[in-house]
Amino acid sequence: MASVIKIYALFLGSALLMFGGGLQGLLLSVRGAEEGFSLLALGLIGTGWSIGFVAGSLTVPLVVRKVGHIRAFSVMAAIGTITILLNLLWINDISWIVLRALSGFCFAGAAMIVESWLNEVSDNRSRGTTFSIYVSVTLFASTAGQMAISIT
């Protein structure tokens, strides 16, 4: 029962992060265009995410080894959330590129942490089912975040 609760919490945390990330990815492009950002700047904002994602994938395993899954996930989720909120305060293309890269770093880290954590708590018989549910939850949440733009 304890492992089911752990997995449920991981799914919920991942879903919330991916919802926010899905909304952020689409909303920044729309808002940047409304603010008059150049097409180059809008492209670099999207590229910043990818650069941050690669950097996070390479760096976060070291963080997990030092502080553990729970603390590392908490830090990635907190910083990822803060970067999204800072986009509201700093409305210029350079800061959005940097914030988007930091956001990509945190989202890659959070995904890596959740996936390694799920790998640890799943046995060989349930691992495929666990990961298929995880991927379904995160893709649904990301899509729902993108669709939420109609509400904003």
Regions found by a protein language model. Give the residues of each.
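Intracellular juxtamembrane helix-capping segments at the cytosolic ends
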Residues: 28, 109-122
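Structural signature of the two symmetry-related core transmembrane helices
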Residues: 71-86
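Residue-level signature of mid-helix packing/kink "hotspots" within the transmembrane helices
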Residues: 50-54, 58, 142-143
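Helix-breaking motifs and short loop linkers at transmembrane-helix boundaries and internal kinks
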Residues: 68, 89-91
